[in-house]
């Protein structure tokens, strides 16, 4: 029994500071609600304040493996957690709970929030990707820029935006050895119901005619990291599990996880 709040606005943040301020404001905002509940419950009733979203779960990682005094963010977090966790507020014994969100999976939206003080790249942080087949390649000036048509669209990726780039997904460098050394990202630039178009990510005003060919071939499979893992993951009944630490066998399926269906 307790209060449940979801910090949806925190997805627009871009720093640990913004994630912390969102968490602080959300917790503080629950206090007046506790006061309103006081007349309905005994004073010795234990309640849980359940707050946060994926950025706040990632924020907690700033506390792992370090002395809080080494980080201003971690030090402030400790202060808020001590104040609101396992203490008495508005006459109730209160414990604090932070929503895990997609902490164990991650996605491009979460990397964009920069809620943790340090991140690795997409390849090391994001556990969910969608495999799609290349069905057409346009590298011969047929279009304004090099493009690749793939057999997945909104029904397989979702259509959730990410605030730090214009695209609907990012192609993993696992898709082609040529992408590993590329200084550009290959992104899902346009998306329709059942197909989408890949293109090089470009800066505003950049001449697209000078872009290099996309190193993919018809029939090849590409791995795409989604903007929002919740939407993308909900579209599939099962997940193929691989182990990226197994050198030479990174793409071998180790298990199949069936998804719980329904709400």
What residue ranges belong to the model's regions?
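Active-site loop/helix belt of alpha/beta enzymes
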Residues: 1-118
């Amino acid at each position: 029994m307790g209060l449940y709040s979801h910090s949806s606005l925190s997805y627009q943040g871009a720093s640990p500071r913004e994630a912390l301020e969102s968490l602080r404001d959300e917790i503080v905002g629950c206090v007046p609600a506790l006061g309103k509940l006081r007349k309905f419950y005994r004073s010795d009733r234990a309640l849980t304040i359940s707050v946060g979203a994926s950025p706040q779960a990632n924020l907690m990682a700033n506390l792992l493996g370090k002395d809080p005094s080494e980080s201003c963010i971690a030090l402030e977090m400790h202060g808020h957690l001590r104040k609101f966790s396992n203490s008495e507020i508005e006459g109730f014994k209160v414990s604090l709970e932070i929503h895990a969100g997609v902490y164990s999976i991650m996605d491009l939206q979460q990397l964009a929030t920069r809620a943790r003080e340090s991140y690795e790249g997409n390849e090391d942080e994001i556990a969910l990707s969608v495999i799609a087949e290349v069905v057409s390649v346009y590298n011969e000036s047929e279009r304004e820029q090099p493009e690749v048509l793939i057999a997945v669209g909104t029904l397989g990726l979702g259509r959730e935006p990410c605030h730090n780039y214009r695209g609907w997904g990012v192609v993993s460098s696992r898709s082609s050895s040529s992408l590993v050394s590329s200084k550009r990202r290959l992104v899902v630039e346009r998306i329709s119901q059942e197909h989408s178009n890949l293109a090089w990510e470009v800066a505003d005003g950049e001449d697209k005619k000078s872009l290099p060919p996309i190193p993919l071939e018809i029939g090849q499979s590409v791995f795409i990291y989604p903007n929002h893992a919740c939407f993308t993951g909900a579209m599939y009944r099962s997940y193929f599990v691989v182990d990226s630490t197994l050198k030479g066998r990174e793409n071998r399926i180790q298990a199949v996880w069936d998804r719980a269906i329904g709400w």
